[in-house]
Amino acid sequence: MENTLVKSLYRDTDKYAGQTVQVSGWIRNLRDSKAFGFIELNDGSFFKSVQIVFDTELDNFKEIAKLPLSSSVKVEGKVIATPGAKQPFEIKAEKIDIEGLSDSDYPLQKKRHTFEYLRTIAHLRPRTNAFSATFRVRSIAAFAIHQFFQERGFVHVHTPIITGSDTEGAGEMFRVTTQDLNNVPKGEDGQVDESKDFFGKETNLTVSGQLNAEAYALAFRDVYTFGPTFRAENSNTTRHAAEFWMVEPEIAFAELGDVMNLTEDMLKYAMKYVLEHAPEEMEFFNSFVDKTVLERMNNVINSDFGRITYTEAIKVLQESGADFKYPVEWGIDLQTEHERYLSEEIFKRPVFVTDYPKDIKAFYMRLNDDGKTVAATDLLVPGIGELIGGSQREERMDVLVDRIKELGMNEEDYWWYLELRKYGGTKHAGFGLGFERFLMYITGMANIRDVIPFPRTPGSSEF
């Protein structure tokens, strides 16, 4: 007999009612009495489990009744519709085969476990409701983002993980080397001789695929990357991880307004898709994790995003009379409290803040005519603050070179990036979405460690 997915049973209960089916899965819960028992069986295809009813007609009734949690079984039985019960159907078992026994010391017993504890058993936590929901939504959201760009003719570019340049100019990068760390070759000046390393120069794990994506945007027009990025930032916060995923589109012949429109469209598309394709998971988050999740998402989907310049935002914050922990003055990088005040109290919806001071933004952002600000934008959303950052890129060779020199960066490291301006450069723009931050926003999960399957944070590289 062919295996039937639990998802299929839930999606088309009427079709299967009265039929004999075979399902395979893991025991999430088991209750028994002398004459009969109930198994909550989850096969991984659906958020909800299926209830298996078994009784003494089974030859191995006593053996089944004593099975430890997480044991895997194969069940044959009849689908019985139960419209008045908690679940729409159950399966009356006619045969249960044991596929794999679980030891009695299985750590996920019938009690609530803290997220902190579950991080210590990250290899088992997807078996819990919270993480089953989280990582299915992660998969669905990733697909939605790919589909959004593919439907619009974007080319998906795989950018390198190992790089010789620092996109952000922040210097917080993981070094890549094959040098013998007990005998590192050094030059006459006593410094490490990078020419003796594998790549013949200093290399690092990428902090962004943006620069490489720009190269392809100037050939394919509309491109995007979706891949892992790495920051050697020693921050033990709920919002930082050493390894995370970024969505980074680049569009040629485009200005800042174009990329803001793209940002708004993508965000609404992805949220709608998740709500449509993960209704059970989203209901779980709204009931047990954050009771504002659905309201927040619908607010984003149904709002026209606001727009305000950084200079105007500073004035609004200064005149608000709010008691901020961090003082507000022109030139500062907005703190989370400022961002949330703008999106929650002033606009009550997502808002783009544009035209930031050049001194607090990256070297590649286009210098505005005032010489003080750049064509950059941050999207601020209620409940979290900054969600997405984007900019129009500097297409003028002389201005870009001056900016690189001004920041004390090595011009030679960016020779190929500068050549993009030399050979038919044009206005272009893009944004970066931290995928995990997006997941935190739509699930209500409060810690980035809980939306990454195996998080990498300072002092933690288990699994």
Curated annotation (Swiss-Prot):
> Which InterPro entries would you find in this protein's record?
Aa-tRNA-synt_II, aa-tRNA-synth_II, aa-tRNA-synth_II/BPL/LPL, Asn-tRNA-ligase, Asp/Asn-tRNA-synth_IIb, NA-bd_OB-fold, NA-bd_OB_tRNA
Claim: Protein biosynthesis is one of the keywords in the record? yes
**Any one GO cellular component localisation term in the record:** cytoplasm
Q: Name one Pfam family in it.
A: tRNA_anti-codon
Write down the EC number.
6.1.1.22
Q: Which major enzyme category is it?
A: ligase
| Keyword Repeat assigned | no
What family, per the record?
A: Belongs to the class-II aminoacyl-tRNA synthetase family.
Q: Which NCBIfam families match?
A: asnS (TIGR00457), PRK03932.1 (NF003037)
The record's note on quaternary structure and interaction partners says:
Homodimer.
What protein does this entry describe? Asparagine--tRNA ligase
Species assigned in the record: Bacillus anthracis
Q: What is the phylogenetic placement of the source species in the record? A: Bacteria, Bacillati, Bacillota, Bacilli, Bacillales
